[in-house]
Amino acid sequence: MAEPGTLRLAHRGDWRAAPENSLAAVEAALAVPGCDGLEFDIRCSSDGVAVLLHDESLARVQRMPAACATLTAAELAQYGIPTLGQVLGAIGCDPFLDVELKEPVQGAIDVLELERGRIDDDGRPTLRSAVVSSFEERILRWVADQRPTWPRWLNASDLSAATIDHALELGCSAISVDWHGIDAGAVARAHESGLGFAAWTVRDEATYRRVEDLGAIAVCVEAGTLDG
């Protein structure tokens, strides 16, 4: 049976309405009744500001052959790339967020703490309806050094025993995994180890329902699957 509360997250916003990771794409996704939140990517501008961008360069989406790290936040804004602060200010605290760090960005920690920080029942700093995720060990260790009690997800291609052990060693609460690498046995291994799981990136409703039925915390979706 599906666990209650499985979240449907828009992968980089709603690409059908606007370029990925743009403020317009984020707002369009959250206007869809079936959308519970967002997954988006964070990089650092040349002046240390956390911005929403997946690739190292602007070539693919913005058609601009420049690296994110060489442009200021103001310059990036000219190409429709918003800051994390702008996005969090626009969407409020209700949507769930999977914030994927592509690199260590101190500005991301500071803005998340300001906009989504809270103290849990045990008196520990945590995040309100948000997690920080990454594929890279060094980034997850960096986040743990910065904010040890914040929830972290390891992004991975499978739920193998090695991946589970790696997530546990990093102190992650869950693994966000390519849906192709998910089956009942793998999920059982993760749950037995005390880890939750999320799935990416699902593009049809049948796959969404299958992963949901296995007990996913969240499913990262695109296109028509966002509509439910």
Name every feature range the model reports, one short phrase each.
Residues M1-G228:
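Phosphate-group recognition and catalysis centered on beta-loop-alpha active-site segments
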